[in-house]
Amino acid sequence: MQSQRNKVVVHYSDGTLLKGYTHDFVPDKESFHLNTALEPGTGTIHEVEISDLKAVFFVKTIEGNSSYTEKRTFEEIDAKALHGIKIKVEFKDGEIMRGISLGYGKAKRGFFIVPIDPRSNNERIYVVASSTTKVAVGAEAEK
């Protein structure tokens, strides 16, 4: 059985970005492999250490849509369509991200969030907990 190729954009803690495909990302593992090829069978394979990352963005398209302005606050969307815990993540680099999480826990090494904007190019984001300065949940995430 062939494993699924996930389109990802890897954000390193130092600001470096890598785009490509992975078939072996597992949150509990220390690393995974990223193929930077846009075509199967080409490109470079990188071993990516989770501890070096800010986040892994699982995306709909590698290219994205630079002309689209993503909704970033809970007020901009239909809150009734959200299923999960509201979450606000503040990263060490100053970026603030809001979304929904089903598995956030303070003691975890990382957690997934789903963007609040259904039209976002991001399907889900794995946030590396050590890259954050603050995480707020529930009503606190709306501030």
State where each predicted segment sits.
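Conserved RNA-binding domains used in RNP assembly and mRNA/RNA metabolism
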Residues: 1-143
